[in-house]
Amino acid sequence: MSDFRFIFFGTPEIAAASLDALKARGMLPVLIVTAPDKPRGRGLVMTPSLVRLWGDAHGIPVLTPTKLSDESFVGEIAKIKADVFVVVAYGKILPEKLLSLAPRGTLNMHPSLLPKHRGPSPIESQVLIEESVEHVGVSVMLLDQEMDHGPILKQKKAVLSEWPVPASVLYDALGRTGAELLAETLPLWVSGDISPAAQDHSTATYCAKIKKEDGLLNLLDDATTNYRKFLAYDMWPRTYFMHEVGGKPSRVIITEAALEDGVFVIKKVIPEGRREMLYEQFLKNA
């Protein structure tokens, strides 16, 4: 087991994968902080995050604060006397009074090769923009008070046999790569065997939070652009186009598509209120 104490902040699957990698190398957090349970599904059943489930399964205390600045929560963190914090897709920015409680700082795994793709949607942004897999990867960095701005400890390029790929594929690939890189970097940082390197802020690029309407396609737009959007938004919000039914606009979700000889070819769709069908069948009935 590790000879240092750390608190882990994270919420989704990519964070749970990092916990698995840390555990495989003998590192378990003394505390986990994750998002509160959320209503999910048609029944709006209150559902814990995957990281909370991971913590419960491994007998690790879990906190689910609604406000990170709450004095009682900050007090709980202070009592732990952790050496270092680790953040993977937690979902909120840690305030300074929280960051100051970790003597060895706070490590963050960010799924892009910083300073490119700073922000909340780096995976989708890489699928939308990057021309080569050579520019796709993950970073382990130290957090500061600016978004994805702190110095870099280690980076690693993605291992993919083709490019571009759907965001869901990149999410899994970078989740695995990032988890291993984090597990490799954390003990090196705590022991003082690795030094941080400042980012070149002059080359930074930024990505925005994805909105539902980002998935709307104009089928007359550039074919490559539409195909990249189809790949980038395959998890959420998915790509769609509008079709008039009975004088009213109706959404048609694209479930399968390809870029063939420079043409964006739609293969399958789900018209609003109907089941998935071949695009040819949809056109016949449109």
Positions of the model-derived regions?
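Flexible, acidic loop-helix segments that line cofactor/substrate-binding pockets
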Residues: 199-217
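A residue-level signal for conserved active-site and pocket-lining positions in enzyme catalytic cores
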Residues: 10, 32, 55, 85, ...
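N-terminal Rossmann-like dinucleotide-binding module
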Residues: 1-42
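Donor/substrate-binding cores of folate-linked one-carbon enzymes
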Residues: 4, 25-28, 84-204
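Short amphipathic alpha-helix with an adjacent loop that forms part of the alpha/beta core around
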Residues: 71-81
